[in-house]
Each structure stands twice: as structure tokens, then as C-alpha cells.
Amino acid sequence: MRIGQGYDIHRLVEGRPLILGGIRIPYEKGLLGHSDADVLTHAIMDALLGAAALRDIGYYFPPEDERWKGADSILLLQQVVQLVGQEGWRIANVDSVVVAEQPKLKPHIPAIQARLAEAMQLSPKQVGVKATTNEKLGPVGQGEAMAAFAVVLLLER
């Protein structure tokens, strides 16, 4: 049994779509990054890689590599799940939280949960997705960024 944790943060900017857990969320700003900047999916990927002792997402998908420019993070997550499986692990569950002041994410959580579960070949009951605010503190609280945390439990195959 292995436990992994992941974290990611990206700036919010105008002119980019907001993608969380592979779902496009209607909002006037999106996250800035080399790929689609999906903070939630990135945090989950890092948690999976960490639990399997496989380094981090920057090692496998470096931002200076043009192959990953604008990449769909759900496709990257599927590659990470495959890597973890090749190391002899299977995912027992994932728990995650997105930290953002706006937009309100509650209406989108079921779709995000379903998309992430599908990408990891899990039941939605194995994928926890929550949202909270940062109580207007720091860059996330001021609406300048979004962050996400994730924890995963891996079991031997």
C-alpha cells in the first residue's frame, strides 16, 4: 500500500479557457500554463507519481517540451495511470480539493468526478472532488490563481 500527495497552482488570466478535471468551466478567466493548466488533474498526477516513487509530472511532461504545449491533461493523466500500473500498482481511491474564490464549482463537481474516474478507469465513488475558498487570503484568495491538492491510495496489483 502506498499513499501519495500532490499540489499544483496556476495563475488565472483572461483569454484562456478554465479546465478543471478535464471539464471546461464557464468563466471569464482561465489558468495559465504550458499545457491546458488543469490544476486539479496535475495535482492528481503528481500524487499518483509520488505514491509510486516515479518523480513528478515535470519529469515526464517538461514545460520546455513543445509536445506538451496546450496538451489535454486528461490524456497525460491516462499516461500516468499506465505508468503506475506498469510499476505494479492500482488505484484504490483519490481525494482532492480545488481552492478558488470564483467561479463556484459545486454545480460542476459531478461532471469533474465522472471525467476523472473515467480517465483513471475507476468508479466515481473512488474519486473525491471538493472545492473550497482561501477566505480571500493570498493570491488564490485575491482571485489571481487557483490551487489544488490531491491524495491517492495505491494498492499492489
Swiss-Prot record:
Pathway: Isoprenoid biosynthesis; isopentenyl diphosphate biosynthesis via DXP pathway; isopentenyl diphosphate from 1-deoxy-D-xylulose 5-phosphate: step 4/6. Binds 1 divalent metal cation per subunit. One of its GO terms (molecular function) is metal ion binding. Its cofactor is a divalent metal cation. The keyword Cytoplasm does not apply. GO terms for biological process: isopentenyl diphosphate biosynthetic process, methylerythritol 4-phosphate pathway; terpenoid biosynthetic process. Keywords: Isoprene biosynthesis, Lyase, Metal-binding. It comes from the Bacteria. 4-CDP-2-C-methyl-D-erythritol 2-phosphate binds at D8, I9, H10, H34, S35, D56, I57, G58, T132, T133, N134, E135. Pfam families: YgbB (PF02542). Homotrimer. Involved in the biosynthesis of isopentenyl diphosphate (IPP) and dimethylallyl diphosphate (DMAPP), two major building blocks of isoprenoid compounds. Catalyzes the conversion of 4-diphosphocytidyl-2-C-methyl-D-erythritol 2-phosphate (CDP-ME2P) to 2-C-methyl-D-erythritol 2,4-cyclodiphosphate (ME-CPP) with a corresponding release of cytidine 5-monophosphate (CMP). Belongs to the IspF family. This is 2-C-methyl-D-erythritol 2,4-cyclodiphosphate synthase. It comes from Synechococcus sp. (strain JA-2-3B'a(2-13)) (Cyanobacteria bacterium Yellowstone B-Prime).
